[in-house]
Design a protein with these regions (language model features):
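Beta-propeller and closely related beta-pinwheel folds
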Residues: 2-24, 59-73, 119, 203-301
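Nucleic acid-processing catalytic cores of prokaryotic defense/repair systems
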Residues: 26, 31-60
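Short beta-strand elements that form the blades of beta-propeller/WD-repeat-like
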Residues: 30-42, 87-93, 231-235, 289-301
């Protein structure tokens, strides 16, 4: 029902006992309540998001129905964090890809899916494996692993390395295929490499968020905020003390450089509005669990 102050009163008795109520404010007079209901294998129910507006349910989003996809369960719903800008709300939790809930052109038009990054953040996972490129420019170059036990996974990103980005020797590559030995990846150069020397395991970087297990390096962020015109993620599974910031004014682009073409050279330059990654240095492990954006970004561990 709609209360005297214009707020929405939602009766939750018919929902799963672990359901979450989350406000979604698109603008004045356009306030919604999202009832997020987790999947529960013990009673064979799917995850659902119920959308309420002025006291009435105007939409129901069900995982696996009408293109909606969200892996919200009884085991992770309590740890979900959200941030919203205009008609998009983003949900994060360390075991699932970031989700985007989008309000369309009307009160009843809603969709939920994995967040579509223009460019994922990148990070070094301190692999004990050297990576050597076969060329500085071009398509179809080889990226060969040695001196360690890291291997390429022959599957499409985020389940495998095909489609993932690799940063090494001041350049950027995108993997297009994996050889059968899982030691050599074939890649296209996006930004020219400075040279073809071997890059040690603590130097080359890989796409930060993925379904890879901890032996490979990946996971998803625990915390989220919009701050000073950037989208901020924090505390991923395998980088629990790290902050990932998007480019300024380009929320879904975490690229740390701007692509510059000069003649036959294509390079990446670091600019003030570029994305960045920052890891908190401390004498003990402090997992980033929450952000509050005010004049400064407050980080809670």
């Amino acid at each position: 029902s709609t209360l005297a102050d214009g707020s929405t009163d939602v009766t939750t008795g018919s929902f799963h006992t672990q359901s979450r109520l989350i406000p979604f404010k698109f603008g004045d007079g356009q306030e919604y309540v999202l009832v997020v209901e987790p999947a529960d294998t013990t009673i064979s129910t799917q995850a659902k998001i119920h959308v309420y507006y002025t006291g009435s349910r105007v939409a129901v989003l069900t995982n696996g129905v009408d293109g909606n996809s969200f892996n919200i369960t009884t085991s992770n719903i309590a740890d979900i964090r959200v941030a919203q800008t205009f008609d998009v709300m983003i949900m994060v939790e360390e075991t699932m890809p970031p989700l985007q809930i989008v309000r369309g052109t009307s009160h009843t038009d809603w969709a939920v899916s994995d967040l579509n990054f223009d460019f994922y953040p990148m990070v070094n996972f301190s692999f004990a494996t050297t990576l050597t490129p076969s060329a500085k420019t071009g398509t179809g170059i080889n990226l060969t692993l040695s001196d360690g036990n890291y291997t390429w996974i022959q599957d499409n990103f985020p389940n495998g390395h095909v489609g993932a980005h690799v940063r090494l020797n001041a350049g950027l590559c995108k993997i297009t295929s994996i050889n059968s030995d899982s030691v050599t990846a074939v890649a296209d150069v996006i930004e020219d490499l400075a040279d073809t020397v071997a890059s040690t395991g603590n130097e080359w970087e890989l796409t930060a968020f993925s379904n890879f297990d901890s032996t490979i390096g990946g996971g998803y962020p625990r915390s989220i905020s919009f701050h000073q015109n950037r989208l901020i993620f924090g505390g991923s599974r395998d980088k629990p003390q790290t902050i990932f910031a998007s480019q300024s004014g380009d929320f879904f682009n975490f690229k740390p450089t701007t692509r510059v073409v000069s003649g036959s050279d294509t390079t990446g330059e670091v600019t003030d509005d570029a994305g960045f990654v920052f890891t908190i240095a401390s004498d003990e492990l402090n997992i980033i669990k929450h952000f509050v954006s005010q004049q400064a970004l407050f980080i809670f561990t």
